[in-house]
A protein has these predicted regions:
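Intrinsically disordered, flexible peripheral segments
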Residues: 1-94, 98, 449-452
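Conserved, carboxylate-rich catalytic/transport cores that coordinate ions
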Residues: 65-453
Length: 453
């Protein structure tokens, strides 16, 4: 057995020596051959004669001057470039600022927009962190998730940085579900949301479920939504938060319908542009009408008074008639759905309260105490250990909820309630003909001398 092992080691050493000598030489040859093979494949599909050829394709408008310059240099001005205004079937190229382009991951995952559609990436990049941070709403949980996200970004970007503290089975499980590159992209998209979550946590006075006053034994207090008799402010002012969520939903639905009207305008479909405007009237009319019916509730705010009831009813009636007139009788079936889409944004508060109440109950039992007695931590060493473990388990559970639920629900609100108002999708990605060169350089002039001769 030992002799066989030595023979195998000798073979490995010999192969390694061969690899060291020839691998650097083979790589550029392989790369150049792949490039030339792709060129030959395309050339076989061109319309051509002995002295000319015709090539048709898509190119971004901003790249046209560069294309003209390259053709002039390659052919000595012996070419003809014909532009067309035809946009049907054009591929889609997403162009967004660097800070926003990371959210293209979600747009591509859902469906690439068509070339003639509004690109929703900017809206997604602005709204998703707000939704995520609002539902998280705790300084401690947000800071912990932010730290993990920053570490993931660094670690995946530096795979040779040394051993990691994460268990092997956990790494294997995560990478089987989400590839490292996608995990890095997700971590980048969560970072702004965690920062927003820290800001909301300060406003809500929530630090791992405790208030700042509780953590500092009453020396420091800061909040924008005050607690009442030890009950978190998010619970005390739940009616106002729900109302704010409804107005957020109304705004998001309206924005989606405006985008839909813009899309229809670019398709020269005036009838459906009017249809989107009538849908906006329906959304505002039915929402304000419903709120005016409950304006007497003492916990509500920003609610219109009942004397405007007739105006809201007229908005709803005009909008409904207009929708049916522009989109057909079947659209009448969808009229109630507009209200459900607006009310869906109440889940923003629901996710927030689930985390707040869970943390409040666990912290009260373990540390703060309840109306029936003091917390476990005051009942001796054994109970103190139990209290610490209970708080730790609650924090871990809330962190897991804080990653999963705000992420899923934030994306869902944008995909379903917002995108459904304007988004068609099924776009074709712009994939320019070319090659990524790592070991070789293109020889443009030499490869086109026959065109210039």
């Amino acid at each position: 057995m030992s002799e066989t092992s030595r023979d195998l080691e000798l073979v490995r050493t010999a192969l390694l020596d061969i690899s060291k000598e020839w691998y650097p030489r083979i790589l550029p040859i392989e790369e150049e051959l792949l490039v030339e093979a792709r060129k030959a494949e395309v050339a076989g599909r061109l319309g051509r004669s002995k002295s000319s050829f015709a090539l048709e394709g898509w190119i971004p408008t901003l790249e046209l001057p560069r294309l003209r310059g390259a053709l002039q240099q390659a052919t000595g001005n012996r070419h003809q470039l014909i532009e067309t205004d035809e946009q049907e079937g054009a591929p889609t190229l997403l162009r967004n600022p660097a800070g926003f382009s990371i959210y293209e991951f979600f747009i591509r995952f859902y469906s690439l927009p068509q070339n003639s559609e509004v690109d929703p990436t900017l809206v997604f990049a602005l709204i998703f962190p707000f939704f995520f941070g609002f539902m998280l709403g705790d300084v401690g949980y947000s800071a912990f998730i932010l730290t993990v996200c920053v570490w993931l970004i660094w670690r995946i970007g530096n795979p040779r940085a040394g051993p990691t503290w994460t268990p092997g089975f956990l790494r294997k499980f995560v990478t089987q579900i989400v590839p490292p590159h996608a995990l890095k992209q997700l971590a980048k998209t969560f970072v702004p949301g965690c920062i927003v979550g820290i800001a909301f946590g300060i406003a809500f006075d929530s630090y791992f479920g405790f208030s700042l006053g509780q953590l500092t034994l009453g020396h420091f207090n800061f909040y924008l939504i005050p607690p009442h008799n030890g009950i978190p402010g998010q619970v005390v002012y739940v009616a106002k938060l729900l109302l704010a969520a409804v107005y957020i939903g109304l705004g998001m639905v309206t924005l989606g319908l405006i985008f839909g009207a813009i899309n229809k305008y670019f398709h020269h479909n005036v009838k459906h542009v009017l249809g989107k405007i009538f849908w906006i009237l329906v959304a505002w009319g039915i929402t304000l009408l419903g709120l005016s019916l409950v304006h007497h509730y003492p916990g509500s705010w920003l609610i219109a008074y009942s004397q405007y009831f007739d105006i809201y009813l007229a908005m709803l009636a005009i909008g409904a008639i207009g929708v049916v007139a522009t989109e057909g009788m079947l659209s009448a079936i969808e009229l109630p759905s507009i209200m459900s889409h607006v009310l869906s944004y109440a889940r923003l508060v629901g996710i927030l309260l689930a985390s707040v109440i869970l943390a409040f109950v666990i912290n009260a039992i373990a540390v703060l105490g309840t109306s029936s007695g003091s917390g476990l931590i005051t009942h001796g060493a054994v109970f103190a250990v139990v209290a610490v473990v209970l708080v730790a388990i609650g924090a871990i559970f809330n962190i897991l909820i804080g990653v999963i639920e705000p992420g899923i629900q934030g994306v869902r609100l944008l995909y379903v309630e917002h995108f459904s108002k304007f988004y068609t999708g099924n776009g074709r990605a712009f994939s320019p003909f070319g090659a990524t060169r790592k070991y070789t350089r293109p020889q443009l002039l030499e490869s086109h001398t026959e065109l210039r001769g």
